[in-house]
Regions:
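Periplasmic solute-binding protein
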Residues: 1-13, 38-60, 140-146, 220-229
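Conserved C-terminal helix/tail region of periplasmic/extracytoplasmic solute-binding proteins
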Residues: 7, 203-254
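Short helix-initiation/N-cap motifs at beta->coil->alpha
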Residues: 15-22, 86-100
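Hydrophobic residues within well-ordered alpha-helices
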Residues: 20, 27, 50-53, 97-102
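Glycine-centered hinge/linker elements that transmit conformational signals in sensory
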Residues: 23-28, 60-88
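Beta->alpha turn/N-cap motifs
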Residues: 38, 92, 109-114
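Paired acidic/hydrophobic, glycine-rich loop segments that form the ligand-binding mouth/hinge
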Residues: 78, 105-110, 126-128
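C-terminal lobe and pocket-closing loops
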Residues: 110-124, 131-226
């Protein structure tokens, strides 16, 4: 968030949905929007909307209701002018550009953007946890370690995968690649744990959710993306978009 914009608007950093709506509205002035997100039809959209779904207290097994609530909230930010309808075409990089160029007071994004912000943002900014609704929740992202079916050296590959996901291996990997770990036992023990801005992301680990929804996840994600497109562009109501998506999602859940 842009610290000066929030200060000029006389508001504090939002901590829940109600205060996020208030802060987004009060920091919206002219062509400057209060909030930018990535809602382009890609995995980025799923990554950004799922925390709102989880924050309702729900999950994909009740997307018709939890998804409707999440989509209605986001659509409400567009309806009151706090967020541009163009977010339906924004990538995460686009959301970052809106923020860096002063066209958005806040954005929802990930730790991978911090290096660019440090380099390019010509203003004082900081990071805060995602505001919550009934509960706190965020998405867990990053790298996946897999062994391909039919691998010639499958035994060795399994050993490597186990090592890379162990505490010792994960620490070496994360410290070398500049990433945070999903392992709770490494929280506060990585090189990046000492960075105050990155620590905000690490501190959300206890309520971070993996997108672990089985082998049909790509189809599930596509249905979520479509529901976002329909709801945020106004092509459908949030309720109808979520209900339609749920009809695809529910039979695919493990």
């Amino acid at each position: 968030y842009n610290k000066q914009m929030l200060k000029d608007a006389g508001v504090e950093v939002p901590t829940d949905w109600a205060s996020l709506k208030e802060v987004a509205k009060k920091t919206t002035k002219g062509d400057v929007k209060g909030l930018a997100i990535s809602a382009v039809k890609s995995e980025s959209a799923t990554f950004q909307v799922l925390p709102f779904v989880w924050q309702t207290g729900g999950d994909l097994n009740d997307y018709a209701t939890s998804g409707a609530t999440a989509l209605a909230y986001l659509r409400g930010l567009i309806d009151d002018g706090s967020m541009s309808e163009a977010v339906s075409n924004y990538t995460q990089e686009d959301a970052r550009t809106q923020f860096i160029t002063g066209k958005s007071a806040m954005m929802i994004n990930g730790p991978w953007e911090l290096a660019t912000l440090t380099k390019d943002a010509q203003f004082d900014w900081d990071v805060a946890p995602l505001p919550q609704d009934k509960r706190a929740a965020t998405s867990m992202g990053g790298e996946n370690v897999v062994v391909m079916n039919g691998a010639k050296q499958s035994d060795a590959a399994v050993k490597l995968a186990k090592y890379l996901t162990s505490a010792e291996g994960a620490k070496i990997y994360c410290d070398g690649s500049g990433q945070l770990s999903s392992r709770p036992d490494l929280q506060g023990k990585l090189k990046l744990s000492n960075d105050p801005k990155l620590k905000v992301f690490e501190d959300q680990l206890p309520y971070a959710h993996a997108r672990a929804y089985g082998k049909d996840y790509p189809k599930i994600s596509e249905a979520i993306q479509l529901s976002m497109q329909e709801a945020l562009t106004g092509a459908s109501t949030p309720e109808a978009a979520a209900k339609k998506a749920a009809e695809t999602i529910t039979p695919l859940l493990p």
